[in-house]
Amino acid sequence: MKTPAQWKAWFESEEFARQTDYQGLLGAAYSPSGTHLRLWAPTAQSVRVDLYRKGDGGACIGSLPLSPWGQGVWGVYLPGDQHGKYYHFNVTTEWGSVTTADPYARAAGVNGARSMIVDLARTDPPGWEQDKRPVIPASKRSVWEVSVRDFSQDPASGVRNAWRGKFLAFTQQGTTLNGDGVHPTCLSYLKRLGVRYVQLMPIFDFGSVDESRPLTRQYNWGYDPANYNVPEGSYSTDPARGEVRVRECKQMIQALHAAGIGVVMDVVYNHMYRFDNVLNRAVPFYYFRQNEDGSLSNGSGCGNEFASERPMARKYFLDSVLYWAQEYHIDGFRFDLMGLYDVETMNLLRAELDKLPGGRDILMYGEPWQGGSSALHRYEANKNNLAMLNDRIGIFCDDTRDAIKGGCFNAREPGYVEGKPGSFWDIGGAVAAWCRSDKFPPHTPGQIVSYVSAHDNFTLWDKLLLVRYERPEFGAVDRAALAQNRLAAGIYLTCMGLPFWQAGEEFARTKKGQGNSYRSSPALNRLDWKRAEQFHGLVDYYRGLIGLRNAFPRLGAVDRASPNAIAFFDLEQPLVGWRLPALPGDGAWWGALCVYYNPTEQEQPIRLPDGRWKLLSDGTSSSLWRGDSRILSGEAVLAPVSATIFGLV
């Protein structure tokens, strides 16, 4: 029996690649006349498939051996219409025999233990063939991140009870707070807010929630993948029937597209729920990165990490992402711990997505870091290697995040909006999407995701209160924190790059100071739709900034020249001010923007550049641009703790 170190050497040898490289179809290839099952298992001594009528329980209705078809592939043909049959494989290697679901399964029963043969055409909702990705120019992109569960779990959401926390909640039209008919929630709220992309936290089948049990006391974000090509069953109305989760996931995407909103899928290929998983049961050790002694590398911090550089692991990764893009019409992909993927694999994926109809508009961005030390010996897809990545692969910019609100690992550390001395230098870097910085200059501003909050760490509201108070009252309306919240939004929503924020940031979302709520209670994690009404002024501030940004396309420019067109003013610290001219013919409402940030608690006089300047947004209202606001020349005064925006008329 080989040791793990010997298997590592064999898997990474040219001889192994020559004998086992396979670029054909894997999984269940369905047709009405019969289904081919193919499993790549080059270390197997034998493979058997067991068939079932149900996805959970019930007797086996037949077992068939798979035959070796070459290049490490085992296969069998099942004649007749097999739609709705469930199966798993029994794989025998030198380690013994194990039962596993199909790594390429596209549907599954409860908890994904059995895969399902599925006619995907039968899962298409009416009108699915006509569903198209919304055409969203770079200048109008903005991303709102949410969990399917959090979106509608609140009883006040107005969503029917059976759909709360489910895919179908996104399809319900006209929801309002407690059904009052006045205050929009869920999809109606998103349409009014004006956001153009929803980033969904993991929607593939994950392992930490038992789909066979009530969900009232179960919760997890889902960063623990079990079946990569199968939607999560707890988000469906019937996890026992494999086709239901597929259909309802498509219905969700279709409804968002109909509202003009793109869907970004948060994908977690960097690790799996546990090392005993569908990939490792099929081919022990192959899919997971190893140290020189054969032990598992743990750059994910979760006990295993995906070996993207190994050819058949890379194929699996590419096949899976492309499947979601094609079958589910996904508009973008956010990569968890992208620093655990190699640059070559990420660039290959970008090239493959670009080949799809409309594929060049599919977003790709990720976290440019790792969760620990990794054995990846090729160039990592991280911030240090940004210059090696395709210029349409973006990164979350923690420099922007920390400069604006303070470090995320120290709850009490302030940032620019809380008055941290010296932080104004990094604010200037953030405005130009770091294209004029020597820290890590990107190819274009489009590579930078500008943000201050995401699902990880503290909500923005909680962070602001933790910096300001020893014992915060998170549920209270705090005017000082509101001003800082508006300033933070006013900064990153006027920075170049792709603006992104955590759902509910715009209504002071709180998790009561919990900085890592991945498995906290549903009540703590869900969106509190009552706060959207309570903090409606803050919601309107975000809404106005989104509209203002859309009215000045150059803020969302992806060309390398635009950041260099920003002229920064020589102002007394810690004020930051800058001017950006519009591009000729780009449809901008104003000839230029002048933007000023004032983090101090005093009014600050400034002198405007020559010309007539309309006040578009101040520290309390971001919708002045929609009406007949003041026209100024010469002197102006900045309100305390404010972002103030002027447009050249």
Task: Annotate each PLM feature.
Residues M1-P32, P68-Q172:
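The feature marks proteins involved in alpha-glucan
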Residues Q19-G24, T494-Q514, L524-L593:
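Glycan-recognition and catalytic regions of carbohydrate-active enzymes
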Residues A29-Q45, A565-P609:
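Carbohydrate-binding surface patches
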Residues A41, G84-Y87, D628-V649:
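C-terminal beta-strand-rich structural cap/linker in extracellular carbohydrate-active enzymes
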Residues Y52, V477, A481, L527, ...:
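C-terminal accessory region downstream of the catalytic core in glycan-modifying enzymes
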Residues V118, R350-A351, K355-F507, Q514-Y518, ...:
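Conserved alpha/beta catalytic core and glycan-binding cleft of carbohydrate-active enzymes
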Residues R149-Y328, L337-P357, L363, S374-A375:
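Substrate-binding/active-site clefts of carbohydrate-active enzymes
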